[in-house]
UniProtKB/Swiss-Prot annotation:
Catalytic activity: D-erythro-1-(imidazol-4-yl)glycerol 3-phosphate = 3-(imidazol-4-yl)-2-oxopropyl phosphate + H2O
Cellular localisation: Cytoplasm
Highest taxon above the source species: Bacteria
Gene: hisB
Entry similarity comment: Belongs to the imidazoleglycerol-phosphate dehydratase family.
HAMAP family from the UniProt entry: HisB
Pathway linked to the protein: Amino-acid biosynthesis; L-histidine biosynthesis; L-histidine from 5-phospho-alpha-D-ribose 1-diphosphate: step 6/9
GO biological process: one example: L-histidine biosynthetic process
CDD domains registered for this protein in UniProt: IGPD (cd07914)
Segments traversing the membrane: none
Protein name: Imidazoleglycerol-phosphate dehydratase
Annotated EC: 4.2.1.19
Cellular component GO terms held in the UniProt record: cytoplasm
Molecular function GO labels: imidazoleglycerol-phosphate dehydratase activity
Length: 202
């Protein structure tokens, strides 16, 4: 089992956004989030809290045009930071799953820290992607965030919406269930010696 600090500090600057992100996978869920997209701040705060990942994010971007660039770019950087902080993945549980309700919404997430990026995202009700949540964040952004994290962190992720009506509740349950599943998958298990794969690498 690795004894190295599982932390990362990643920055990204483009013509569309500027991002500075720090995380600690073995934290307590503390967070300081400022992306200029309030609902996204709320979702990232929930992710940090329920995954027990300490997370600091400062992001600015061309939100006067659309929130898409800033939201997706933060997801990219978060994925890169997760990948860096995981290191060689020695001693991790690797797999995690969680079923999380928020009032009428119910979402299941399954995570495999596999090194093979793959996202299966299903079950959102018809029209969800068109809803404005919190005034600026469209429902379609939820999938974009998971795509960005999954690809850049090297995760296999299944997120399945099993029920729900309120777009806020559905989106929040998605982030929370992903967080809980990721929390299980990234945990260090003292019984695991080396890389949790018969191939010897992830």
């Amino acid at each position: 089992m690795s004894t190295l600090a599982r932390t990362a500090h990643v920055t990204r600057q483009t013509s569309e956004s500027t991002i500075d992100l720090q995380l600690d996978l073995d934290g307590t869920g503390a967070s300081e989030i400022s992306t200029s997209v309030p609902f996204y701040d709320h979702m990232l705060t929930a992710f940090a809290k329920h995954s027990l990942t300490d997370l600091r994010v400062t992001a600015t971007g061309d939100t006067h045009i659309d929130v898409h660039h800033t939201v997706e770019d933060v997801g990219i950087v978060l994925g890169q930071a997760i990948r860096e902080a995981l290191g060689d993945k020695s001693g991790i549980a690797r797999f995690g799953d969680a079923l999380v309700p928020l009032d009428e919404a119910l979402v299941q997430s399954v995570v495999d820290i596999s090194g093979r990026p793959f996202l299966v995202h299903s079950g959102e009700p018809a029209g969800f992607e068109m809803h404005l949540i919190g005034g600026h964040f469209t429902g379609s952004m939820v999938r974009h965030v998971f795509e960005a994290i999954t690809f850049h962190a090297g995760l296999t992720v299944h997120v399945t919406v099993l029920g729900g009506r309120d777009p806020h509740h559905i989106a929040e349950a998605e982030f929370k269930s992903f967080a809980r599943a990721f929390r299980q998958a990234k945990e260090l298990d003292p019984r695991v010696s080396g890389i949790p794969s018969t191939k010897g690498a992830l």
